[in-house]
Each structure stands twice: as structure tokens, then as C-alpha cells.
Amino acid sequence: MSVYVDFDVPADLEDDALEALEVARDTGSVKKGTNETTKAVERGNAELVFVAEDVSPEEVVMHLPEIATEKEIPYVFVGTQDDIGHAAGLQVGSAAAAIVDAGEANGEVEDIAEKVEELQ
């Protein structure tokens, strides 16, 4: 487990979160990549943040859980960058992503946020 991963996410919750990212990508708005995700979190625009567990060097995403907690934005760890990239509609992996407007995934995002809060 990476240094920045501070709780384990069950596989079913990870799958639900990635599905919500796909729906938000199609019906709402998502930010892809560490820089865009960081900006969305710092501005308080993010509804749910995704961080890959396989990022190297770890310093690339190490700050995200801390600033998300500071801004009271839920975040979830996902196994690989490829999982996030695929769900966000990219042909390549992405170390991080954020749902800015959940669109039709609004209910799912709220459920995921509650479950993540219980895990932390």
C-alpha cells in the first residue's frame, strides 16, 4: 500500500465510484489529471475525488487526500491509473480525477461520500 493511502476501499465501493465517474463524465463534468483535480479541490468545486494507488513517484498525488480533507471533500482510492483514465474517458491512465458536476450520478456520489466517510 502506498504511503498516501490512508484507508482501504472495498472492491464494490471502488466499482461504484468508477461507475459514477463514467456517468458524471457523460452527463455532468469531470476534471482529469493531478493538476486539474488539485485546482478543483482547492477551489472547492469537486464533489468527489479519485486518487490512484499505483502512482510513482507518490509525491505526485500525495497532497490530494490532505487538501480534500481540509476542504471537506470526499475522496476514494482506486487501484490503478488506468481504471481512472478509462472511467474518465481517456485513452491513457490518470493519477487523479474529480467529479465537479455529478449530473445524473448525483445520488450515487452522495451514497459513495457517506460510505467513504464511514471508512475514514
From Swiss-Prot:
Q: SUPFAM superfamilies under this entry?
A: L30e-like
User: Known Gene3D superfamilies for this protein?
Assistant: 3.30.1330.30
Disulfide bonds, paired cysteine numbers? none
| UniProt-listed InterPro entries | eL8/uL1-like (IPR050257), Ribosomal_eL30-like_sf (IPR029064), Ribosomal_eL8/eL30/eS12/Gad45 (IPR004038), Ribosomal_eL8/Nhp2 (IPR018492), Ribosomal_eL8_arc (IPR022481)
| HAMAP family associated with the record | Ribosomal_eL8
Tell me which Pfam families the record gives: Ribosomal_L7Ae
Molecular function via GO:
ribonuclease P activity; rRNA binding; structural constituent of ribosome
Q: Where in the cell is it found?
A: Cytoplasm
Give the quaternary structure. Part of the 50S ribosomal subunit. Probably part of the RNase P complex.
User: Does the keyword Ribonucleoprotein feature in the UniProt annotation?
Assistant: yes
Please provide the record's keywords in A-Z order: Cytoplasm, Ribonucleoprotein, Ribosomal protein, RNA-binding, rRNA-binding, tRNA processing
The gene name on file is: rpl7ae
Q: Which GO terms describe its cellular component?
A: cytoplasm; ribonucleoprotein complex; ribosome
Q: Primary place of residence?
A: cytoplasm
Record function comment:
Multifunctional RNA-binding protein that recognizes the K-turn motif in ribosomal RNA, the RNA component of RNase P, box H/ACA, box C/D and box C'/D' sRNAs.
Family statement drawn from the similarity comment of this UniProt entry: Belongs to the eukaryotic ribosomal protein eL8 family.
* Name the record gives this protein: Large ribosomal subunit protein eL8
